[in-house]
Amino acid sequence: MNVETITSRQNPLMTHLRKLASSRSYRKKSGEYLCDGTKLLDEALKWGAPVQTAVFSDGVEIPTLPDTVRAVCVSEDLMRSVSPMETPQGALFTVALPETKLPETLAGKHYLVLDSVQDPGNVGTILRTADAFECDGVFLVNACADLFNPKTARATMGAIFRREAYSVTPEELFALLSKSGVPLYGTALREDTVPLSDANLSKAAVAIGSERRGLSQQMLDECAKTLKIPMSPRCESLNAAIAATVVLWEMYR
């Protein structure tokens, strides 16, 4: 396996990696996204993700890579200068963006909708949990964190390489759910709210809102009913990722 050595921070590849880390529009334009860590690289290779380039710190054991992957070695100092993480894990790699196309109809039974969930760690953790509980799909609407942000990808722990997720407009989502006969429920309080454990989730999409604002009015207007997670009156709300975990577990069991 041929491994290049790069020493300059101004090298075009290093500049490319920094842009992938910081710019959603650049990721879309270049057709690649950036991931961090040897464990995540192992997951990418295991699940056949289209890895393009892999960069390793000096001293890190380089795994067997497909012949199509460009392998590069850099100093630890150079790795710190390009890594989007405060504590680099010894490897950065780029993956081709998937050509995700919305299906004509939804064949599954359990879906999760994220409405303005803007923290990358929360979005990544939710996708990881959706994978664990065999959710049939996750939809991101209204300025959610980018699924392909390096921090989001890292938090998925590999689920990004095997679980379907779609960034859609509210109108696209509502039309698809209606066409597929999948009712939309939301985690919010209003006159028709029922406890989550009492809801019929045998076929449903459940929307989770941001911690600051909850569900958007547009989303609430489309919800057939709203659901609440019973909790101590001392607590006003749950972290979005925790709320999603409870919902996903109820749909799974």
Where do the protein language model's features map onto the residues?
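Boundary-proximal intrinsically disordered activation/regulatory segments immediately upstream
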Residues: 1-60, 144-145
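Short acidic-hydrophobic, aromatic-tinged amphipathic segments that line or gate anion-handling sites
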Residues: 4-8, 72-75, 163-173
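RNA substrate-binding interface of SAM-dependent RNA methyltransferases
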Residues: 46, 98-99, 103-190
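Glycine/small-residue-rich loop that forms an oxyanion/phosphate-binding "nest" at active or ligand-binding sites
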Residues: 63, 68-96
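Active-site regions of enzymes building and remodeling cell-envelope glycoconjugates
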Residues: 66-76, 109, 202-205, 224
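Short beta->alpha connector loops at strand-helix junctions that form conserved
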Residues: 74-75, 115, 141-142, 164, ...
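Structured adenosyl-cofactor binding patch, chiefly the S-adenosyl-L-methionine
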Residues: 93, 132-133, 147-160, 217-253
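Active-site/ligand-binding-proximal alpha/beta "capping" segment
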Residues: 185-235, 239
